[in-house]
Amino acid sequence: MSVYGLQRLYIGGGYVDATSGKTFDTFDPATGELLAQVQQASAADVDRAVASAQEGQREWAAMTAMQRSRILRRAVDLLRERNDELAAIETRDTGKPIGETLAVDIVTGADVIEYYAGLATAIEGLQVPLRAESFVYTRREPLGVCAGIGAWNYPIQIACWKTAPALAAGNAMVFKPSEVTPLTALKLAEIYTEAGVPAGVFNVVQGDGSVGALLTGHPDIAKVSFTGGVETGKKVMSLAGASSLKEVTMELGGKSPLIVFDDADLDRAADIAVTANFFSSGQVCTNGTRVFMHRSVKDAFTQKVLERVKRIRVGKPTDADTNFGPLVSAAQLDKVLGFIESGKAEGAKLLAGGTRLTDGHFGSGQYVAPTVFGDCRDDMKIVREEIFGPVMSILDFESEDEVIARANDTHYGLAAGVVTENLSRAHRTIHRLEAGICWINTWGESPAEMPVGGYKQSGVGRENGITTLEHYTRIKSVQVELGRYNPVF
């Protein structure tokens, strides 16, 4: 018997059964308990979801921007009213501490919907005079039906981030959450329907990567927004282009540098480094896992980091005192433990953690201790590759030019940060770092107003911020002639 029972697809404003006859299981990563059986969508189900979205989108786009804005604001109110209920589900599904999901996941998702609800009425075209009797005007029109493919680390937040600009601009979306954390996207669908979003405007299909491929290759999907790993992102982008030249937004992986200069407030720097590596058990794409510290502060900084790691409260995610939970799945645990063994084998110095936690209730969950490696080199696997777990690599440097070159020596370019009391140095360094999201003397906040996305192989396009609306509209140019038409023939 599962906790939440059988989970169906959400198409056309309500729950429907999948036609595949297949289901998959989702588990609580803290206890191993079966949470739900989830119906897997078939190709016919994807077609049905897209057709429903096309119908709903026509009704949604015909509304005024103010009408759409009011409906989205009602959805925000409902999300906030149900915050505690949704946070409890998210904690069971992801393993995140309840204090984290209560304060972050639904809250920040609702903030983004509220932000775009306010911008819905600000989508407008231009008027361009050509001469006394002729002018051009432009219209920003919705794309139509978009596909959203979510990652397992922030299920409901990612669903909100992808739907908010799409719906504000008059589009519909068919969303596929990760099969690892599939539950809360369905709750978001319920909320949109209750708020007054027309049937079909937000549909949820469940399943593995094969369902994502069906969406990506579907001829009636105009755009794909994907969050996940680099290699999968490349496949999505290739299929999107090959099928129908779809627009894409890609929020992919990272191996982000955090640079601590010799004049930094070391207490602040240590606080930032620990947050940038161990928040959400290290399962955050923007984590600052390559911590570069100036050689002159190596010992003092490392000691402060280790003091803070000892204060991390690993425990049951449902306990209010816990601030560090399990990894999301057994597969992710095995991956992280493999990286830890690689670090040991390549000569990194293990300063903290490095083991799976198995005592007591930890034995039934996917727990690994917060891990810190010192004496790391740039060529180590733990320094070069994204781990997506609680593993910090500490490296030292001597000069500004040196550390910038080393920080940029990666095919990733998602995030970067510096800690220094010298603002000139801070801005000078940030301007040279090849990353799309940067922080000075802080780390990790991604407010609705801030565009987020990567350079290089960390992504294409942006999420959040005003600029994202451009990625969910297309421009129509119209010339108007008020005077005499001069024929060519």
Swiss-Prot record:
Entry's cofactor comment: Binds 2 potassium ions per subunit.
Keyword NADP: yes
Pfam families: Aldedh
Metabolic or biological pathway, per its Swiss-Prot or TrEMBL entry: Amine and polyamine biosynthesis; betaine biosynthesis via choline pathway; betaine from betaine aldehyde: step 1/1
Binding-site positions, K(+) 2: 245, 456, 459
GO MF term list: betaine-aldehyde dehydrogenase (NAD+) activity; metal ion binding
Record-annotated active site: 162 (charge relay system), 251 (proton acceptor), 285 (nucleophile), 463 (charge relay system)
Residues reported in the UniProt entry to bind NAD(+): 150-152, 176-179, 229-232, 253, 285, 386
Record keywords, A-Z: Metal-binding, NAD, NADP, Oxidation, Oxidoreductase, Potassium
Gene3D superfamilies: Aldehyde Dehydrogenase, Chain A, domain 1 (3.40.605.10), Aldehyde Dehydrogenase, Chain A, domain 2 (3.40.309.10)
Cofactor names: K(+)
Gene Ontology biological process terms in this record: glycine betaine biosynthetic process from choline
CDD domains (alphabetical): ALDH_F9_TMBADH (cd07090)
Site (Seems to be a necessary countercharge to the potassium cations): residue numbering on this chain: 247
Alphabetical list of InterPro entries matching this protein: Ald_DH/histidinol_DH, Ald_DH_C, Ald_DH_CS_CYS, Ald_DH_CS_GLU, Ald_DH_N, Aldehyde_DH_dom, BADH
Catalytically driven reaction(s): betaine aldehyde + NAD(+) + H2O = glycine betaine + NADH + 2 H(+)
Presence of the UniProt keyword Aminoacyl-tRNA synthetase in the record: no
Top EC group: oxidoreductase
Residues the record lists as Cysteine sulfenic acid (-SOH) modifications: 285
Positions contributing to K(+) 1 binding: 26, 93, 180
PANTHER family reported in the protein's UniProt record: ALDEHYDE DEHYDROGENASE-RELATED
Known role: Involved in the biosynthesis of the osmoprotectant glycine betaine. Catalyzes the irreversible oxidation of betaine aldehyde to the corresponding acid.
Family listed: Belongs to the aldehyde dehydrogenase family.
Subunit structure: Dimer of dimers.
Protein name (record): Betaine aldehyde dehydrogenase
Organism for this UniProt entry: Burkholderia cenocepacia (strain ATCC BAA-245 / DSM 16553 / LMG 16656 / NCTC 13227 / J2315 / CF5610) (Burkholderia cepacia (strain J2315))
Source lineage: Bacteria, Pseudomonadati, Pseudomonadota, Betaproteobacteria, Burkholderiales
